[in-house]
Curated annotation (Swiss-Prot):
Principal place of residence: cytoplasm
Keywords: Cytoplasm, Hydrolase, Metal-binding, Nucleotide-binding
A UniProt-annotated Pfam family: SurE
Cofactor: a divalent metal cation
Gene Ontology CC: cytoplasm
Domain of life the protein comes from: Bacteria
Protein's name in the database: 5'/3'-nucleotidase SurE
Cofactor note: Binds 1 divalent metal cation per subunit.
Species whose genome carries this gene: Edwardsiella ictaluri (strain 93-146)
Catalytic reactions of this protein: a ribonucleoside 5'-phosphate + H2O = a ribonucleoside + phosphate; a ribonucleoside 3'-phosphate + H2O = a ribonucleoside + phosphate; [phosphate](n) + H2O = [phosphate](n-1) + phosphate + H(+)
Function: Nucleotidase with a broad substrate specificity as it can dephosphorylate various ribo- and deoxyribonucleoside 5'-monophosphates and ribonucleoside 3'-monophosphates with highest affinity to 3'-AMP. Also hydrolyzes polyphosphate (exopolyphosphatase activity) with the preference for short-chain-length substrates (P20-25). Might be involved in the regulation of dNTP and NTP pools, and in the turnover of 3'-mononucleotides produced by numerous intracellular RNases (T1, T2, and F) during the degradation of various RNAs.
EC id: 3.1.3.5, 3.1.3.6, 3.6.1.11
EC supergroup of this enzyme: hydrolase
Location in or out of the cell: Cytoplasm
Amino acid sequence: MRILLSNDDGVTAPGIQTLAAALREFAQVQVVAPNRNRSGSSNALTLESPLRSETLANGDISVIDGTPTDCVYLGVNALMRPRPDIVIAGINAGPNLGDDVIYSGTVAAAMEGRHLGFPALAVSLDGERHYDTAAAVTCRLLRMLSDAPLRSGRILNVNVPDVPLTAIRGWRVTRCGSRHPAQTVIHQQDPRGKPLMWIGPPGAKQDAGEETDFAAVAAGYISVTPLQVDLTAHGARGRLAEWLGRVDKGGAAW
């Protein structure tokens, strides 16, 4: 099995390095990751400037000022030959639950892999301690996928409780929960008295019902949420068409 491994925390982050070491026990792994932390970069793609890569002493490839999406795009189309069998993003330092997934560079890296035609996993740890637990979970999931391929055409967003492996209670297939809108802005000044602003923490949980990823991880279960690239709200199309037909009295005459 050939694995392209990326993340949004940076090429030397403990999560990606722990996972790379575990995966190399049974697979060929090429790390292609940002040279620095790019958390929260979502699906950003660098189009206005060239990108430079650097191969580190251990064979990992660092993309200078690249986003996670850049890294997967370059990994698939230029830097990993032969191409990978699967794209994995992680292990992220901290969870990617609920509507956090729309901001997550980790999830975006997996989404780019899926968009380019490959099976893809995003793996996050609900903390920054037990990376070995998340690595073991990922390896087990990969072996299961190898033995019985899941041809769902979806990204699997995996969130692992930050506990020893022996404390994991099992798997749960979940849906994304949601948060209240975030509103906090932290105001500061630079040494010259100019204003600075920091984006504050995420909003509090709004929907953390039993079937959500929030609830699964809080209860000690591994949350596995199938995600898709198609953002169309298919159930709303009929209502939208009816509304347009009813309120647009001018029809096609502009």
